Amino acid sequence: MEASTKAAVGSGAMEASTKAVICTVCSSFVVFQILFHFVSYWFSARVSSGYNSLSIDKKIEWNSRVVSTCHSLLVGIFGLYLFFFDEATITDPLWGDPTYVNINIATASGYLISDLLIILFNWKVIGDKFFIIHHCAGLTAYYFVLTTGALAYIANFRLLAELSSPFVNQRWFFEALKYPKFSKANVINGILMTVVFFIVRIISIPPMYFFLYSVYGTEPYIRFGFVIQSVWIVTCVILDVMNIMWMIKITKGCIKVISLIRQEKAKDSLQNGKLD
């Protein structure tokens, strides 16, 4: 009797958790769609005087990046809190209670589905095969996290990469508004973008694979089964290869801007010297 009661309670809790996840994913999807189609138009026109002068294509990308920034700040900050204070997943990174992390993962999943639709419906404007690969890899991993309760800590750790997106998007906003490349705001944002991207997307790579190596073959790892083990490794490799490619591109751009600034300063010094 007691065993059957516990089983019933466990089943009920799991069903409630599943409903909560589905509701969060759907709510997230709807909210980010509303942000893209309505809120960003209204908000951007009031915050930036240059928004109304942009072409329709530019406005579409602008709005998608506003949504991206909102998502990144939301899941990034919440993810950072969970990374330091969610005792359940910190204590057991492989099978710890994913209740709070699931909220973050479900929110991110709703955004990824929303953004995939936006990209597909506006392919000629913002279509990018790398974003499709990135989103599909993320959704695949999140599906298994949300349905099995495994690897919640790792999934949340990967979400911290979103903390770099606001700086990447801000660079695009400056470019769309035709801010001078050497303006103080542009240069500071560029440096911050490079540093933050490196910290949350590149420095985090070695610890991730060291942890994978340390748990490989253990009983909790074996419990995953072949499918989850494969998804963990394959999706991480795909995302990390893309992050390294983007990091190289960002670093080259940052070095180029810094070298041009030095050249401009050297010219100014030379001109001042001649004038003196």
Curated annotation (Swiss-Prot):
The modification N6-acetyllysine is found at K178. It holds the Pfam family TRAM_LAG1_CLN8. It is found in: Membrane. Keywords: Acetylation, Membrane, Transmembrane, Transmembrane helix. GO terms for cellular component: membrane. The keyword Mitochondrion does not apply. It is a multi-pass membrane protein. Its main location: membrane. Residues 57-259 form the TLC domain. The chain crosses the membrane at residues 20-40, 66-86, 101-121, 130-150, 191-211, 224-244. It comes from the Eukaryota. Belongs to the TLCD4 family. This is TLC domain-containing protein 4.
